[in-house]
């Protein structure tokens, strides 16, 4: 659906930004790391993850692909929702979080608000083999490749 938003930063707060694209302001929930990356800028390109539920359509924005990929891995863990994943990503930069997970440091994860011992262990067990600190996985690398719409359509059809 929406891969990214590019436009003027209309409003920027530690937990959310409004990106004006074509006269429409999109409210995008962000981590503190993305907030820091956007500070002082008038325009931005924010990578997006959409969460479409029965009661809400919520956009999550990321300054880079590594953060978005980690967010998607985190929300795939049972018991970790989008809000908790955003808090985790606000607590550590991507390199540090990857190292914590790869190293099995449950104590560090438990220090994050909303993460208990069982959830910390589940994150480590579920993601340890999927994360190599400093490296993008094959799926993450493929998500960086731009495929034109006609090509994408012919691949899907």
Where are these regions (language model features)?
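Nuclease catalytic cores that cleave nucleic-acid phosphodiester bonds
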Residues: 104
